[in-house]
């Protein structure tokens, strides 16, 4: 599925589903994965899909292309990153799951980054949805991540301290996204 932002797209909140929706104006509707309690007050008001939204979407999509994933998943991750950037309430960092990175990189918006789990040193992929001075709001860019106290699924948000993030290198990708979906 290839989607192209359009000036007829619009954001609205669906009271029945308690989710932010994006009307794609072609009979398709994208439903955000974030529950109502995570969304800011502006998410509950209808608004147009702006030129800035389109620019962010294309920025996320371009960076996500580094990861071996189907176009549907790429669009889902890009749209959820855009929603996280625009409409998510602030989150507190939860960096205790990850090792401090030895490479000093300054994360940038829409960057695909990796981090290593403290207990296993397993590499984990995230997409930077929002950059902060000390920490970034990131979305999980792989099918699943088992942590010691919970399991994250694709597109789940986590705020991570910048010193835990490192530049993603394709050859170090832990597994193919396509095979994870099949198994």
Swiss-Prot record:
Biological processes per GO annotation: division septum assembly; FtsZ-dependent cytokinesis
Highest rank taxon of the organism: Bacteria
GO cellular component: cytoplasm
Location of this chain's protein in the cell: Cytoplasm
InterPro entries with a match to the protein in the record: ZapC (IPR009809), ZapC_C (IPR048372), ZapC_N (IPR048373)
KW Membrane (keyword) present: no
Residue intervals passing through the bilayer: none
UniProt keyword list: Cell cycle, Cell division, Cytoplasm, Septation
Family: Belongs to the ZapC family.
UniProt cross-references to HAMAP family, sorted A to Z: ZapC
Subunit details: Interacts directly with FtsZ.
Role noted for this protein: Contributes to the efficiency of the cell division process by stabilizing the polymeric form of the cell division protein FtsZ. Acts by promoting interactions between FtsZ protofilaments and suppressing the GTPase activity of FtsZ.
Name by which UniProt lists this protein: Cell division protein ZapC
Organism: Proteus mirabilis (strain HI4320)
Lineage, top ranks: Bacteria, Pseudomonadati, Pseudomonadota, Gammaproteobacteria, Enterobacterales
């Amino acid at each position: 599925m290839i989607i192209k932002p359009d000036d007829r797209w619009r954001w609205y909140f669906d009271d029945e589903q308690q989710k932010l929706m994006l009307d794609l104006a072609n009979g398709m509707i994208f439903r955000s994965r974030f529950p109502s309690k995570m969304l800011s007050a502006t998410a509950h008001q209808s608004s147009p899909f702006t030129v800035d939204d389109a620019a962010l979407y294309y920025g996320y999509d371009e960076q996500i292309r580094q990861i071996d994933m189907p176009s549907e998943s790429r669009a889902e991750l890009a749209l959820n990153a855009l929603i996280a950037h625009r409409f998510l309430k602030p989150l507190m960092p939860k960096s205790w799951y990850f090792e401090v990175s030895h490479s000093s990189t300054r994360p940038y918006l829409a960057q695909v980054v990796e981090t290593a789990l403290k207990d296993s040193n397993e590499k984990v992929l995230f997409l930077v949805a929002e950059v902060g001075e000390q920490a970034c709001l990131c979305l999980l860019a792989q099918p699943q991540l088992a942590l010691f106290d919970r399991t994250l699924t694709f597109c789940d948000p986590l705020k991570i301290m910048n010193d835990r993030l490192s530049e993603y290198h394709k050859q170090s990708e832990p597994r193919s996204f396509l095979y994870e979906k099949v198994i």
